[in-house]
Amino acid sequence: MPVFTTSFCALIFFVYILDNFLLIPKTETVTVKEKLWSGHNKGYINHALHLSEKKIKRGQIWRLVSSSLLHIGTWHIVSNITATLIVGCAVESQLGAAKTALCYIGATFISGLYMAFVYKLGEGEGASTGIYGLIAVFVMLAVKNGTFFFSPVPAIALIVLAVYTVGGMLLGKTTAFEHISGFAGGLLMGFILM
């Protein structure tokens, strides 16, 4: 049973429900469409956890990792949970829960540093930086084992993962840099932990 992967997916889904539907300041106007589909960043949790260079410089360093708990819109949360389940289960079957969690958190942290202080991203949220880190570790394990089918991941799941990976790079310059820095962080964590 992939303990980290399933627990993390449950956590980000729980945070998504709280932030998008329940914990919204009364002073904010959020439409039904924003709540159900396109998303918004007006919730209390988003304000407390999103990536922000200014707030990190004021000592709120948890934002380097906590932003990975946030998602804007239904497509964002569904695609990230799907990708996390596919790649996370595969990596966790080889490395175990603790090393998988360290790879995810390390990649998110490294990407957060890059996006906040090099790229100068104003605000950011999403689990994809850690997911791209796990994809990097997945590729490293595949090379080490000599095959992409080293885990219980079926071929169709690998196709979905490939679409997620390529599609995520096409969403714009900022998103591409987040994903590339997450992948680079995953490579670094993979070299350290494998």
Placement of each model-derived feature along the sequence:
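A detector for small-residue-rich transmembrane helices and their helix-helix packing motifs
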Residues: 1-194
